[in-house]
Amino acid sequence: MRQTENTAIVLRYANYRDHDRMLTLLSPTRGRMEVLSRGCRRPRSPLLNASELFALGDFQLYIKQERATLVSANLLETFYLLRADFDRLAVGVYLLNLAEAAAQPGQNCQELFLLLLHTLSRLTFSDQEWKPLLAGFLLHYAAAGGYKPRLMHCVTCGRRMTPQERAWFDLGEGGLSCEGCHARQAVPLAPEQVRWMRRSLMGGASTWVNDEEAYAPYVLLRDFVERRLERPLRSAAMLPK
C-alpha cells in the first residue's frame, strides 16, 4: 500500500443528524482526528463505504477553525471479510478501540498505524489463530506505548534469567520475576510462554503463532495492557472466549 499524508483508517463512527456521521480516524502523521462526513448515510452517497468501521483510504479533508469535514475519499481496503466471522470481527473492533485509546490528536502515530494495519490484514486474510495474533498485537502495542514488558532480567534483583528457569510475571512492575523475588500476586509462566513473548517481540505479525515450543500468554497480556488504559473498553466484553 502506498501511504500518503491523507491516508487514514476509520476507528469509530457516530450517527449525526439524519444523514451524517462523525468519524474518528487514525492517521499515521496526524494522529487521532474527528471528522464530519456529511450526507454519508444517504444510499447513493460517494462517502458511504468510506464512513464505515475499518475503512482504510486516502481522505481529502476541508479544515476550518480546527473542524474537519470529509470532502472525498479514495477507498483502499474495507476488511469486509471480517464481517463473515463474528469472533474475528469482535477482535477487529477491539483492535480499533485499543488504537483509539493510544492515539492523540496531532501526534505521529506511524508505528501504531502500521501495527494496526498489519494485524488487521492477518486477522482478515489469513487463517492464523486469533488468540496468539491478538497477544502479539498487545505485546507490540505495549512497546509502542512506552511500557514494553521486561523479559530478559528479573524486575526486582536485575539478574539475567535463563531460558530454563521458572518465571513469574509481575503486572505492576511490568516484567519477569525470578523464583526468589516474585511477589505473591505475580502470575506464574511456563517456559514456553516466556519463549513466545521473547520471540514475538522480535518478529512481525506472521510469527505470532502457537506451537509446541512456544505459546502465547493471551490472558496475561490482555490484563497487562487493559489495566494501563485510562478507561475500560466496552468491546473487551464482546471478545470470544
PLM region descriptions:
Residues 1-22, 26-241:
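Non-catalytic alpha-helical scaffolds and adjoining flexible linkers that form interface surfaces
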